[in-house]
């Protein structure tokens, strides 16, 4: 438990460090949720801002509103008015004349009698602007009204109807409406007509009083804070609250999913697992880490929601528990979603959107009462986002008193039930995480079948239970010895007893089988092998030999099919957890976090591996950092380290802590020889007490480091033993390399020399005779005669015209190749056949007949066809997903096709009766003014039929407070402002004044209660009441309403916005593939290979246009079928879509230059297009509607100008503009127009069409200009006119001689440098490249004033440390970057001024594998054949020839994305050699390749380079020696030497290397004493290494006292024969020369060079 606790703390520290380093991420986690919550409150506050007017609404006199242009029309159903009706109208005229102080005749013009209902309606339709209102009398007699006081009696009432435009009154079909009150009756003409009519009726029936009636909304009853949110809670929070809260919390889920998938993607989690990571600790650590920021934010959200009382009734504890549990379920969902992603680019986004979509579905599930509550609970148990939606719904409705009564609580889940589902969610999700982690397949690791829980094996053997059969099995270290003896296997070297007793790893009959489409494949075939403590064990083999599979089984990533292995006594089949506690690993992938520093990495892994003391962690980390040569980089983020430094950090991670079993997979990959040497020293110094398993493709590394070496092929152990054992067993002898004398090279006789050697060594073989060097192979069996032979050879050197010679022993690489080709006879036959098959040679040698645009275009289109067909996801994203979105927009457009009415068009009559409107239970509170109010109440209102519903309030009662406290009981109330007694009895005021207060949502309250009181007052006077009815006219449409009639404006807007989203997604996905090709350098390789830049863009445009055309054609056809407007304007819509596609795609390409991945590019470009387009579109919609509403031509002119600007800024906006025009959106019409007569006019579609055409041209030209900018810069700036800095003062003599030769333009002499004669096919003079530093970074001379000429047929090698200038040189020669100064000439053409001709015959194999992962090797080679201009009829032959030569036949039809690194390099090299180029630039061709592949590559390069110039850069010394007739070593951009390999070794070499193996008898006297005997024979020797019976020494060979090879062999074979079992001698290697010449740069050299540069740049004062 203590160990798990320690791991948990370590992982928490790591996670928190990562979180703290991501300042942007922390800001997002804090700011994003706050913004979301603030957005919720902004909406809620916005809803509250639109609160109604609570002030008193006063009505003015009728006379102030009516005039000759604003008349009253009146009439009756009977054709004429009866006496009472005519009397009332006359009374109205009379009262109006008194108010206006005019005569009756003058006032009469304000009235017009129309006694036909239809005629009145027609008149209103024609003259609506001149009609104040209408009055209609339906009956010629007084109507009867039932008396609610006494139901057996009826009373007479005077009936009339007021007629206004239906949009000036409220909907007669509704009694209540949320958010609407009676104020419209007061603000429009209704109140004036009703008051005037009632006043006229009063006057006619003898009650001559002026009516002053005002209106006021009920005082706001929501006085408490929680009540103030009711409107927002009802309209927003009830439904969308959970969405906002989920979105705020999902930022943490987004980040967590991304982090989890990134660690899976980068194999960091895999590496930690191998080194003992507990998976439960891993998951818990990430949950805690996420909660560190998520929980405080969650609590802040809770405090805001409860503190603001948006959530009021639900208790604090319920809200806290609900949201905390929900947050925890979201974190668990993050783990579940992360299981299904291998790449991080879409993981977080898709998780975010999916959970949010589930939450939105939960809104409908929670609110729909038709869904059974048990089904709701079940869904909540499965999906917690549904639960939170239901929770917010019930919390909200509890705080909406008017709503709760209408909800069936039996169909609503309670908060406590939801908490219960959350608890279940947590348990269920935890189980699901555990279950999915066991069954979901990943790239590495063993997984169970989905049904594993139902198997007997799992419950008896799995789940951590020990297999008793295996537990009782004792492994025997002597098994392998017995196997060897029984099989007489002399390929395995016996292990001494004292070493055998230190066995730490014992592999027994280990076997792994894989089921493939081709049947069963055996990756490891009954392997038996032992490894020992204190040793480095090299595990070698060609690609696919089973090395990685074996290591995967030893580390627990794979389970064996049969057999087992024991590591420190623990069985890998059931004790892997124990094994991993002592395991360290350095995978091929760098398992590091870019944000963390070197020191933080080491401290984390030290703690993870069991070191608990903080001081010890610190000291161990510092010590390790210094030992791996990163002491000066302690606080440098790992992402800023070079590739080699990252490998060193991974090495330190593997060794730090308690690791005793170390697996190193390609630990020195990507390092230069100097860095590799330092790593070797580190490994040798740390191997004590450890077992190190080393895999590498550098055989010299395995040779130098490994105590024992195992070579595996096809899953079987081929041989196992020390390096010397393998060399003696499989060695092919010594290599003798002789340098011919320069002055007498033409007198050299190869037959004479060969015969001399053959006389003493009969089996000698001539390997090569090229230029100034000749090489011989001397068999190992002739070792006893070497002493005499070399003595005789030394005496005859001058006779043979040989200046010097070198001797080297069989290398481990040669052993490896011999073993590999012995096993793989097919490979051997292919390799040997490459040079002899004439037909193969002819096919490979097919030359380019010239680059053809048509051929390139066809090839690039075929490439797009194949990649698109193989990548269904990209196809789905680029075509189907946008199509679905667009179809969705059309569905919205047509499914919501019913016209949305933004005005009231109800013309049903409505009688304003309290009984009819609000029933018998509605109470009418009434408060009268004056001291006699109660008397007045009983006297003057008791005759009302609704008197029983009146509620008298005396003056001591606070009227407003009463209404607030009892607002649910009444629809309206009355407050008299003048005592009725003074008005009706004393006749002192002649005014009846009261305020009619209307309750909110009761839309007809004001006219109902005015009619109620006026009816009561009149009845009290003479028993006659008043009945008022609303009889609306048909609505007269405004210009905007006419324009929008018959259409759903909302659906048009939604349709266009969603369609814009679809086409934005289309454009973004197309740009994603361009961004990906640029990031993966595919485009660069195409350009280097001769692809014309405009052809590249044309091919992409044509392909994307093709898909876009399909999309737009489907869109046009569907819209034409479902909508007549689009059918009528099909041509316009189709043209706009075509132009839009032609413009948006190149614009998206332009945006793609700023993004580095498909996911980022697609998402960002989609967002850019959509956001810009939508913002502009919505802004213009609002502006155009304002134009029509205000009928402003000046505003229309401004809109036109803005419209043009928007069209120019965004093609998407221009396209949307055309859609608006075609759809007939009212905002698209010109002022005064009811329809569009000419869609093609400039005021309509022509303007966006023309601008879209301009977009097409501009953006297409723009992307070409950007890509052709290097050419333009080259034409404007010629590097030949810029002087390079002067040559270094200490320049090597051979380098100076080459500079002088080229400057004099003399032909190349035949020299010892192997340059041969004839003219140079490639030469550069004064080549210099200075990179200008940015900020504080200094300028850097990448290449410093280099001069070189290379003739046809020569392979030239470039060596140097990382950053020496090799790749920069190759890039300048390839025309990829421009030199700062100097001249490059290729085949007589200047690279700058005659670029096309110079690069015509140049081909490049770049350092990177810029392969199209979705194409096979065959498809890839066919593509580049066409790019390079190979004739179409020859392409198939050429491709097949290269596939055969490179041994790619078995995988030629598989996508290159699945190839190993070596096979990818073979394809890249083949691409470079296609078309028989005259100059081939090969940059690190063998990087990541095993020796067999390197051997095959060397054969290909050697065979094909006979008539070419080849420049080769490499970190492999053996590769340079095998291929290059001339070479140089670069340091700080300068040539440090120049010549053949033997010339350079002779000139700069330090002597000879001697490797000896002592006899076992030496153990008795001690190895140190035996070593002392060797040193006495070689006094100047230095011991380089000693382990077991092996020792390596270096013998200096000073020029003043040279040592002869014959003397060395003589001493070894005579004086030391008694103590030596075996020995080997070789000249100082090229690698040692390399290390010598690439030592640290001296400060004085840098200062001197800087001074020379300054002197060169200072102008002459003369």
UniProtKB/Swiss-Prot annotation:
Stretches that traverse the bilayer: 30-50, 242-262, 284-304, 317-337, 346-366, 377-397, 417-437, 872-892, 1052-1072, 1102-1122, 1130-1150, 1163-1183, 1201-1221, 1246-1266
Annotated membrane topology: Multi-pass membrane protein
Ligand binding (ATP 2): 1360-1367
Location (main, coarse): membrane
Chain sites annotated for binding ATP 1: 541-548
Entry-linked Pfam families: ABC2_membrane_3, ABC_tran, R1_ABCA1
Family: Belongs to the ABC transporter superfamily. ABCA family.
Protein name, UniProt field: ABC transporter A family member 5
């Amino acid at each position: 438990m203590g160990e798990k606790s320690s791991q948990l703390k370590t992982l928490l520290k790591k996670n928190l460090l990562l979180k703290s380093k991501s300042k942007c991420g922390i800001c997002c986690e804090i700011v994003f949720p706050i913004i979301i919550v603030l957005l919720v409150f902004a909406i809620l506050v916005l809803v509250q801002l639109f609160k109604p007017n609570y002030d008193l609404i006063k009505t003015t006199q009728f006379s102030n509103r009516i005039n000759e242009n604003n008349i009253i029309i009146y009439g009756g159903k009977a054709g004429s008015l009866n006496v009472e009706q005519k009397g009332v109208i006359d009374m109205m005229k009379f009262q109006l004349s008194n108010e206006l102080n005019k005569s009756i005749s003058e006032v009469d013009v304000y009235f017009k009698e129309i006694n036909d209902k239809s005629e009145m309606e027609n008149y209103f339709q024609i003259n609506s602007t001149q009609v104040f209102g209408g009055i209609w009398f339906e009956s010629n007699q007084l109507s009867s009204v039932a008396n609610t006081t006494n139901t057996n009696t009826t009373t007479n009432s005077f009936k009339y109807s007021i007629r206004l435009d239906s949009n000036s009154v409220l909907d007669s079909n509704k009694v209540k409406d949320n958010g609407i009150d009676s104020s419209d009756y007061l603000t429009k003409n209704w109140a004036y007509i009703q008051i005037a009519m009632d006043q006229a009726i009063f006057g006619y029936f003898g009650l001559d009083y002026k009516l002053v009636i005002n209106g006021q909304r009920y005082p706001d009853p929501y006085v408490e804070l929680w009540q103030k949110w009711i409107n927002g809670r009802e309209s927003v929070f009830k439904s969308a609250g959970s969405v906002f809260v989920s979105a705020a919390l999902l930022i943490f889920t987004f980040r967590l999913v991304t982090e989890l998938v990134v660690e899976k993607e980068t194999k960091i989690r895999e590496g930690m697992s191998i080194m003992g990571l507990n998976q439960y600790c891993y998951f818990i650590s990430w949950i805690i880490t996420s909660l560190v920021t998520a929980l405080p934010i969650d609590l802040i959200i809770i405090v805001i929601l409860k503190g603001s009382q948006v959530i009021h009734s639900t208790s604090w504890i319920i809200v806290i528990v609900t949201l905390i549990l929900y947050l925890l379920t979201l974190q668990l969902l993050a783990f579940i979603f992360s299981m299904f992603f291998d790449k991080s680019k879409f993981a977080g986004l898709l998780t975010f959107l999916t959970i949010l979509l589930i939450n939105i579905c939960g809104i409908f599930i929670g609110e729909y009462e038709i869904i059974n509550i048990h089904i709701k609970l079940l869904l909540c148990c499965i999906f917690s986002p549904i639960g939170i939606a239901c929770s917010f719904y019930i919390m909200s409705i509890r705080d909406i008193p008017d709503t709760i009564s209408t909800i069936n609580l039996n169909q609503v889940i309670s908060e406590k039930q939801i908490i219960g589902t959350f608890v279940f969610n947590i348990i269920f999700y935890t189980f699901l995480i555990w279950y999915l982690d066991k069954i979901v397949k990943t790239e590495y690791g063993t997984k169970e079948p989905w049904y594993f829980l139902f198997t007997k094996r799992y419950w008896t053997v799995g789940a951590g239970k020990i297999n008793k059969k295996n537990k009782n099995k004792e492994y025997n270290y002597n098994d392998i010895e017995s196997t060897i003896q029984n099989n007489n296997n002399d390929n395995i070297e016996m292990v001494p007893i004292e070493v055998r007793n230190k066995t730490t790893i014992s592999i027994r009959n280990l076997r792994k089988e894989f089921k493939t489409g081709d049947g069963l494949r055996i990756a490891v075939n009954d392997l038996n092998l032992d490894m020992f403590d204190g040793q480095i064990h090299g595990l070698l083999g060609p690609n696919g030999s089973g090395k990685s599979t074996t290591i995967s089984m030893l580390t627990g990533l794979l389970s064996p099919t049969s057999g087992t292995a024991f590591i420190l006594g623990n069985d890998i089949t059931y004790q892997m957890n124990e094994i991993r506690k002592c395991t360290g690993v350095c995978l091929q992938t760098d398992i590091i976090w870019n944000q963390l520093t070197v020191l933080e990495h080491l401290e984390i892994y030290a703690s993870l591996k069991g070191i608990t003391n903080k001081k010890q962690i610190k000291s161990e980390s510092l010590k390790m950092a210094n030992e791996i040569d990163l002491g000066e980089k302690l606080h440098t983020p790992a992402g800023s380290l070079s590739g080699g430094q990252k490998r060193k950090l991974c090495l330190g991670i593997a060794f730090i802590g308690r690791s005793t079993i170390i697996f190193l997979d390609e630990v020195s990959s990507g390092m230069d020889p100097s860095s590799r040497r330092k790593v070797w020293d580190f490994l040798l110094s740390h191997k004590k007490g450890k077992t190190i398993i080393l895999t590498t493709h550098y055989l010299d590394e395995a040779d130098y480091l490994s105590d024992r070496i195992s070579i595996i092929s096809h899953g079987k152990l081929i041989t196992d033993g020390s390096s010397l054992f393998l060399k003696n067993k499989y060695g092919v002898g010594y290599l003798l390399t002789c340098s011919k004398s320069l002055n007498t090279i033409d007198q050299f006789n190869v037959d004479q020399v060969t015969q001399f050697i053959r006389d003493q060594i009969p089996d000698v073989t001539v390997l090569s005779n090229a230029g100034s060097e000749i090489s011989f192979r001397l068999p190992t069996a002739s070792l006893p005669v070497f002493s005499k032979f070399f003595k005789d050879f030394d005496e005859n050197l001058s006779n043979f015209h040989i200046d010097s010679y070198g001797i080297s022993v069989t290398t481990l690489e040669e052993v490896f190749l011999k073993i590999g080709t012995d096993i793989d006879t097919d490979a051997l036959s292919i390799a040997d056949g490459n040079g002899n098959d004439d037909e193969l040679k002819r096919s490979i040698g097919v030359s380019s007949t010239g680059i053809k645009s048509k051929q390139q275009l066809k090839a690039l289109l075929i490439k797009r066809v194949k990649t698109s067909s193989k990548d269904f996801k990209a196809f789905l994203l680029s075509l189907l997903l946008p199509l679905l979105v667009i179809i969705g927009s059309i569905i919205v457009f047509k499914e919501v096709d019913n016209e949305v009415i933004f005005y009231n068009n109800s013309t049903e009559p409505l009688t304003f009766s309290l009984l009819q409107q609000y029933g018998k239970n509605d109470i009418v509170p009434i408060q009268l003014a004056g001291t006699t109010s109660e008397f007045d109440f009983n006297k003057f209102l008791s005759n009302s039929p609704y008197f029983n519903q009146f509620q008298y309030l005396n003056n001591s009662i606070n009227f407003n407070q009463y209404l607030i406290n009892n607002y649910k009981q009444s629809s309206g109330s009355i407050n008299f402002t003048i005592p009725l007694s003074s008005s009706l009895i004393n006749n002192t005021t002649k005014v009846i004044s009261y305020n009619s207060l209307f309750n909110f949502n009761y839309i007809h309250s004001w006219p109902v209660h005015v009619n109620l009181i006026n009816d009561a007052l009149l009845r009290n006077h003479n028993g006659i009441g008043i009945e008022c009815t609303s009889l609306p006219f048909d609505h007269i449409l405004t210009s905007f309403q006419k324009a929008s009639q018959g259409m759903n404006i909302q659906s048009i807007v939604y349709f266009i916005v969603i369609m814009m989203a679809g086409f934005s997604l289309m454009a973004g996905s197309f740009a994603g593939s361009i961004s990906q090709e640029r990031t993966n350098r595919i485009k660069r390789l195409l350009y280097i290979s001769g692809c014309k830049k405009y052809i590249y863009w044309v091919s992409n445009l044509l392909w994307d246009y093709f898909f876009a055309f399909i999309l737009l054609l489907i869109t046009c056809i569907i819209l034409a079928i479902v909508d007549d407007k689009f059918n009528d304007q099909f041509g316009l819509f189709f043209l706009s879509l075509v132009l839009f596609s032609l413009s948006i795609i190149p614009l998206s390409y332009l945006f793609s230059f700023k993004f580095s991945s498909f996911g980022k590019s697609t998402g960002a470009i989609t967002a850019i297009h959509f956001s810009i387009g939508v913002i502009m579109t919505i802004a213009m919609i609002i502006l155009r509607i304002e134009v029509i509403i205000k009928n402003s031509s000046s505003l229309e002119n401004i809109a036109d100008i803005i419209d043009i600007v928007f069209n120019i800024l965004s093609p998407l906006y221009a396209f949307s503009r055309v859609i608006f025009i075609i759809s007939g959106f009212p905002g698209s019409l010109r002022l005064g127009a009811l329809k569009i007569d000419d869609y093609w006019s400039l005021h309509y579609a022509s303007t966006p069409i023309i601008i879209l055409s301009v977009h097409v041209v501009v953006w297409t030209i723009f992307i070409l200009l950007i890509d052709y900018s290097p050419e333009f810069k080259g034409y404007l700036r010629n590097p030949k006119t810029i002087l390079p800095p002067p040559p270094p003062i200490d320049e090597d003599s051979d380098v100076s001689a080459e500079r002088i030769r080229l400057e004099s333009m003399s032909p190349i002499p035949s020299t010892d440098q192997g340059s041969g004669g004839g003219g140079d096919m490639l030469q550069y003079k004064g080549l210099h490249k200075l990179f200008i530093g940015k900020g504080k970074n200094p300028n850097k001379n990448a290449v410093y004033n280099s001069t070189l000429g290379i003739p046809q047929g020569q392979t030239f090698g470039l060596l140097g440390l990382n950053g020496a200038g090799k790749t920069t040189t190759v890039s300048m020669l390839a025309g990829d970057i421009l030199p700062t100064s100097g001249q490059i000439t290729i085949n007589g053409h200047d690279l700058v001024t005659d670029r096309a001709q110079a690069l015509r015959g140049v081909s490049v194999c770049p350092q990177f594998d810029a392969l199209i992962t979705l194409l096979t090797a065959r498809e890839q080679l066919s593509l580049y054949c066409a790019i390079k201009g190979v004739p179409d009829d020859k392409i198939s032959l050429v491709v097949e020839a290269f596939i055969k030569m490179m041994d790619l036949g078995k995988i030629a039809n598989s996508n290159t994305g699945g190839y190993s690194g070596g096979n990818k390099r073979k394809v890249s090299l083949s691409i470079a050699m296609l078309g028989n180029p005259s100059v081939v630039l090969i940059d690190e061709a063998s990087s990541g390749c095993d020796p067999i592949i390197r051997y095959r590559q060397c054969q290909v390069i050697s065979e094909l380079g006979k008539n070419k110039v080849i420049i080769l850069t490499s970190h492999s010394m053996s590769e340079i020696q095998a291929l290059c007739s001339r070479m140089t070593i670069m340091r700080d951009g300068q040539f440090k030497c120049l010549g053949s390999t033997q010339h350079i070794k002779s000139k700069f070499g330090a002597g000879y290397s001697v490797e000896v193996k002592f006899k076992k008898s030496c153990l008795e006297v001690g190895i140190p004493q035996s070593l002392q005997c060797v040193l006495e024979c070689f006094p100047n020797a230095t011991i380089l290494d000693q382990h077991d019976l092996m020792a390596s020494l270096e013998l200096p060979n000073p020029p003043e006292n040279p040592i002869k090879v014959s003397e060395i062999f003589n001493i070894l074979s005579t004086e030391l024969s008694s103590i030596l079992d075996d020995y080997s001698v070789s000249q100082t290697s090229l690698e040692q020369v390399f290390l010598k010449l690439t030592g640290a740069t001296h400060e004085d050299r840098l200062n001197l060079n800087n001074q020379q540069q300054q002197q060169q740049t200072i102008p002459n004062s003369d």
